[in-house]
Amino acid sequence: MDKKQPHPLFKLATELGPLLVFFAANAKFNLFVATAAFMVAIVAAMIASYVVTRHIPLMALVTGIVVIVFGTLTLVLHDETFIKVKPTIIYSLFAGVLGGGLLFGRSFIAIMFDQVFNLTPRGWQVLTLRWALFFFGMAILNELIWRTQSTDFWVNFKVFGAVPLTMIFAMMQMPLTKRYHLEPATLEASDASEGDVRK
Protein backbone atom coordinates (compact mmCIF):
# COMPACT_ATOMS: atom_id res chain seq x y z
CA MET A 1 0.00 0.00 0.00
CA ASP A 2 1.38 3.42 -1.00
CA LYS A 3 1.84 5.89 1.81
CA LYS A 4 -0.28 9.03 1.51
CA GLN A 5 1.73 12.22 1.81
CA PRO A 6 0.30 14.38 4.62
CA HIS A 7 -0.18 18.12 4.31
CA PRO A 8 2.88 19.95 5.72
CA LEU A 9 0.72 21.68 8.35
CA PHE A 10 -0.71 18.34 9.46
CA LYS A 11 2.80 16.90 9.72
CA LEU A 12 3.90 19.94 11.73
CA ALA A 13 0.90 19.63 14.04
CA THR A 14 1.53 15.95 14.80
CA GLU A 15 5.22 16.60 15.46
CA LEU A 16 5.01 19.81 17.50
CA GLY A 17 1.52 19.47 18.96
CA PRO A 18 2.47 17.05 21.76
CA LEU A 19 5.43 19.25 22.76
CA LEU A 20 3.22 22.32 23.00
CA VAL A 21 0.75 20.35 25.12
CA PHE A 22 3.65 19.31 27.36
CA PHE A 23 4.84 22.92 27.70
CA ALA A 24 1.37 24.31 28.43
CA ALA A 25 0.53 21.62 31.00
CA ASN A 26 3.83 22.14 32.81
CA ALA A 27 3.29 25.91 32.89
CA LYS A 28 -0.23 25.59 34.32
CA PHE A 29 0.17 22.54 36.55
CA ASN A 30 3.40 20.57 37.08
CA LEU A 31 5.75 18.16 35.35
CA PHE A 32 3.75 15.08 36.30
CA VAL A 33 0.50 16.42 34.83
CA ALA A 34 2.50 17.55 31.81
CA THR A 35 3.95 14.05 31.42
CA ALA A 36 0.49 12.46 31.44
CA ALA A 37 -0.78 15.03 28.94
CA PHE A 38 2.29 14.47 26.76
CA MET A 39 1.66 10.72 26.67
CA VAL A 40 -1.96 11.21 25.63
CA ALA A 41 -0.96 13.77 22.98
CA ILE A 42 1.74 11.48 21.56
CA VAL A 43 -0.71 8.59 21.22
CA ALA A 44 -3.32 10.90 19.67
CA ALA A 45 -0.75 12.19 17.17
CA MET A 46 0.23 8.66 16.12
CA ILE A 47 -3.42 7.64 15.72
CA ALA A 48 -4.14 10.77 13.66
CA SER A 49 -1.09 10.08 11.49
CA TYR A 50 -2.22 6.53 10.82
CA VAL A 51 -5.82 7.54 10.08
CA VAL A 52 -4.73 10.20 7.57
CA THR A 53 -1.73 8.48 5.95
CA ARG A 54 -2.17 4.79 6.88
CA HIS A 55 1.38 5.02 8.13
CA ILE A 56 3.26 6.00 11.29
CA PRO A 57 6.76 7.41 10.65
CA LEU A 58 9.49 5.26 12.17
CA MET A 59 10.96 8.09 14.25
CA ALA A 60 7.51 9.01 15.58
CA LEU A 61 6.80 5.38 16.48
CA VAL A 62 10.09 4.92 18.33
CA THR A 63 9.68 8.25 20.10
CA GLY A 64 6.12 7.38 21.09
CA ILE A 65 7.14 4.03 22.58
CA VAL A 66 9.96 5.60 24.61
CA VAL A 67 7.65 8.41 25.81
CA ILE A 68 5.03 5.91 26.97
CA VAL A 69 7.58 3.71 28.77
CA PHE A 70 9.47 6.51 30.50
CA GLY A 71 6.33 8.55 31.08
CA THR A 72 4.74 5.59 32.84
CA LEU A 73 7.84 5.15 35.02
CA THR A 74 7.74 8.86 35.85
CA LEU A 75 4.11 8.71 36.97
CA VAL A 76 4.19 5.34 38.75
CA LEU A 77 7.40 6.06 40.67
CA HIS A 78 6.67 9.80 40.94
CA ASP A 79 10.21 10.50 39.80
CA GLU A 80 10.75 13.20 37.18
CA THR A 81 14.19 11.82 36.33
CA PHE A 82 12.70 9.32 33.88
CA ILE A 83 10.91 11.87 31.69
CA LYS A 84 13.97 14.12 31.75
CA VAL A 85 16.33 11.37 30.63
CA LYS A 86 13.89 10.28 27.92
CA PRO A 87 15.31 12.62 25.23
CA THR A 88 18.81 11.35 26.03
CA ILE A 89 17.63 7.78 25.42
CA ILE A 90 15.94 8.72 22.13
CA TYR A 91 18.88 10.75 20.83
CA SER A 92 21.35 8.05 21.85
CA LEU A 93 19.23 5.35 20.22
CA PHE A 94 19.05 7.22 16.92
CA ALA A 95 22.77 8.06 17.05
CA GLY A 96 23.65 4.45 17.81
CA VAL A 97 21.47 3.00 15.06
CA LEU A 98 22.73 5.47 12.45
CA GLY A 99 26.37 5.13 13.50
CA GLY A 100 26.13 1.36 13.78
CA GLY A 101 24.56 1.16 10.35
CA LEU A 102 27.50 3.04 8.84
CA LEU A 103 29.92 0.51 10.34
CA PHE A 104 28.11 -2.19 8.38
CA GLY A 105 27.82 -0.10 5.23
CA ARG A 106 24.16 0.74 5.73
CA SER A 107 22.59 4.20 5.67
CA PHE A 108 19.47 3.94 7.81
CA ILE A 109 18.78 7.66 7.48
CA ALA A 110 17.59 6.83 3.96
CA ILE A 111 14.66 4.95 5.48
CA MET A 112 13.56 8.18 7.16
CA PHE A 113 14.13 10.54 4.22
CA ASP A 114 13.60 8.43 1.09
CA GLN A 115 10.25 10.09 0.39
CA VAL A 116 11.96 13.51 0.32
CA PHE A 117 15.44 13.03 -1.16
CA ASN A 118 17.05 11.01 -3.93
CA LEU A 119 20.75 10.93 -3.09
CA THR A 120 23.82 9.08 -4.26
CA PRO A 121 25.18 6.39 -1.91
CA ARG A 122 27.94 8.80 -0.87
CA GLY A 123 25.33 11.46 -0.14
CA TRP A 124 23.36 9.13 2.13
CA GLN A 125 26.58 8.14 3.89
CA VAL A 126 27.59 11.74 4.65
CA LEU A 127 24.06 12.72 5.67
CA THR A 128 23.81 9.72 7.98
CA LEU A 129 27.12 10.54 9.66
CA ARG A 130 26.09 14.15 10.22
CA TRP A 131 22.75 13.21 11.77
CA ALA A 132 24.40 10.56 13.96
CA LEU A 133 26.81 13.18 15.32
CA PHE A 134 23.98 15.68 15.77
CA PHE A 135 21.87 13.22 17.77
CA PHE A 136 24.90 12.31 19.89
CA GLY A 137 25.51 16.00 20.60
CA MET A 138 21.86 16.55 21.50
CA ALA A 139 22.00 13.61 23.93
CA ILE A 140 24.96 15.22 25.71
CA LEU A 141 23.26 18.63 25.70
CA ASN A 142 20.07 17.22 27.22
CA GLU A 143 22.08 15.55 29.98
CA LEU A 144 23.92 18.77 30.77
CA ILE A 145 20.73 20.83 30.93
CA TRP A 146 18.48 18.57 32.99
CA ARG A 147 21.25 17.82 35.48
CA THR A 148 22.32 21.45 35.99
CA GLN A 149 19.20 23.56 35.39
CA SER A 150 15.70 23.85 36.83
CA THR A 151 12.77 21.79 35.56
CA ASP A 152 11.14 24.83 33.96
CA PHE A 153 14.38 25.69 32.16
CA TRP A 154 14.62 22.12 30.87
CA VAL A 155 11.02 22.17 29.62
CA ASN A 156 11.62 25.49 27.86
CA PHE A 157 14.76 24.11 26.25
CA LYS A 158 12.92 20.98 25.12
CA VAL A 159 10.31 23.07 23.29
CA PHE A 160 12.10 26.28 22.32
CA GLY A 161 15.68 25.03 22.16
CA ALA A 162 15.82 21.45 20.89
CA VAL A 163 13.18 21.94 18.20
CA PRO A 164 14.76 25.07 16.64
CA LEU A 165 18.21 23.47 16.82
CA THR A 166 16.92 20.42 14.95
CA MET A 167 15.20 22.55 12.32
CA ILE A 168 18.28 24.72 11.82
CA PHE A 169 20.51 21.66 11.52
CA ALA A 170 18.13 20.11 8.98
CA MET A 171 18.18 23.29 6.88
CA MET A 172 21.98 23.34 7.04
CA GLN A 173 21.97 19.98 5.23
CA MET A 174 20.25 21.39 2.14
CA PRO A 175 23.54 22.20 0.33
CA LEU A 176 24.61 18.59 0.87
CA THR A 177 21.34 17.21 -0.53
CA LYS A 178 21.74 19.43 -3.59
CA ARG A 179 25.37 18.42 -4.09
CA TYR A 180 24.60 14.69 -3.98
CA HIS A 181 21.15 14.87 -5.55
CA LEU A 182 20.37 11.96 -7.85
CA GLU A 183 18.13 12.73 -10.81
CA PRO A 184 15.16 10.33 -11.31
CA ALA A 185 16.54 9.11 -14.66
CA THR A 186 19.90 8.39 -13.06
CA LEU A 187 18.17 6.65 -10.17
CA GLU A 188 16.18 4.41 -12.53
CA ALA A 189 19.33 3.56 -14.48
CA SER A 190 21.13 2.75 -11.24
CA ASP A 191 18.27 0.49 -10.10
CA ALA A 192 18.20 -1.24 -13.49
CA SER A 193 21.96 -1.76 -13.35
CA GLU A 194 21.70 -3.26 -9.89
CA GLY A 195 18.93 -5.54 -11.14
CA ASP A 196 21.10 -6.79 -14.01
CA VAL A 197 23.94 -7.51 -11.62
CA ARG A 198 21.68 -9.60 -9.40
CA LYS A 199 20.52 -11.78 -12.33
UniProtKB/Swiss-Prot annotation:
The protein's matches in Pfam families, at most eight in alphabetical order, are given as: IspA
Kindly indicate whether the keyword rRNA processing belongs to this entry.
Answer: no
HAMAP family reported for this sequence: YciB (MF_00189)
This chain's protein is named: Inner membrane-spanning protein YciB
Q: Which family does it belong to?
A: Belongs to the YciB family.
Function of this protein? Answer: Plays a role in cell envelope biogenesis, maintenance of cell envelope integrity and membrane homeostasis.
- Localization per Swiss-Prot or TrEMBL: Cell inner membrane
TM ranges are 7-27, 32-52, 56-76, 93-113, 126-146, 153-173
Disulfide pairs?
Answer: none
Signal peptide (UniProt feature, chain positions): none
Q: Which UniProt keywords apply?
A: Cell inner membrane, Cell membrane, Membrane, Transmembrane, Transmembrane helix
Lipid bilayer topology: Multi-pass membrane protein
Its GO CC terms are:
plasma membrane
Where would you say this protein principally sits, based on its record?
A: membrane
